[in-house]
Amino acid sequence: MVYRGFGLDQVSPPENKPFDQLSPEEQGEKGAQMMVEFMTSCPGKAAISGVTGFALGGVFGLFMASMAYDTPLHTPAPTNAPGLPNKVKELADLPLKQQIKIQFSDMGKRSYSSAKNFGYIGMIYSGVECVVESLRAKNDIYNGVAAGCLTGGGLAYKSGPQAALVGCAGFAAFSTAIDLYMRNENKKPPKDDFDE
């Protein structure tokens, strides 16, 4: 096996020797080769998507939770917060320190919940898409459609067949729209309007 591109045609991967018998350069090359192999495998892609989805979901959840407090006078007080008297109807009736404590606690919970959901969906979708692509041995838009349908249907199957069908259609449509947008740069360039 020889690496392709970027002038690496002359570089071969290290021989199959025990790791401790390799030179430092060969150890680095072997480590890089192992990382690339992991990152291009289906479990690796699923793990990377899960971690990335968790991080982005946390940021998104934190942002959305912070937007929930844009009108503090009309924000109802949480009913299950410990130490709150029953007569408190709105968050603005509480002392400032308690308001801040409740808001940060709520933002943390919402952020973590959103992070878990995004990570879970990203991991499942990416893993299913990789498996579908491996089974079909093609890289086209239908992999994303099938993965979206299987992911959406799989996530909603506990709610019944109608919900699974709606989840399948919704995820497949969203995946198709994203894939069409991302593959847009592979199209034929537009006609030159100076020739007309």
From Swiss-Prot:
Record's subcellular location: Mitochondrion inner membrane
Gene Ontology biological-process annotations: protein insertion into mitochondrial inner membrane
InterPro entries: TIM22 (IPR039175)
Pfam families (UniProt xref): Tim17 (PF02466)
Membrane topology: Multi-pass membrane protein
Ranges annotated as spanning the membrane: 47-67, 141-157, 162-182
Stretches for region Disordered: 1-27
Function of the molecule: Essential core component of the TIM22 complex, a complex that mediates the import and insertion of multi-pass transmembrane proteins into the mitochondrial inner membrane. In the TIM22 complex, it constitutes the voltage-activated and signal-gated channel. Forms a twin-pore translocase that uses the membrane potential as external driving force in 2 voltage-dependent steps.
Subunit details: Component of the TIM22 complex, whose core is composed of TIM22 and TIM54, associated with the 70 kDa heterohexamer composed of TIM9 and TIM10 (or TIM8 and TIM13).
Name of this protein: Mitochondrial import inner membrane translocase subunit TIM22
The organism of origin for this protein: Kluyveromyces lactis (strain ATCC 8585 / CBS 2359 / DSM 70799 / NBRC 1267 / NRRL Y-1140 / WM37)
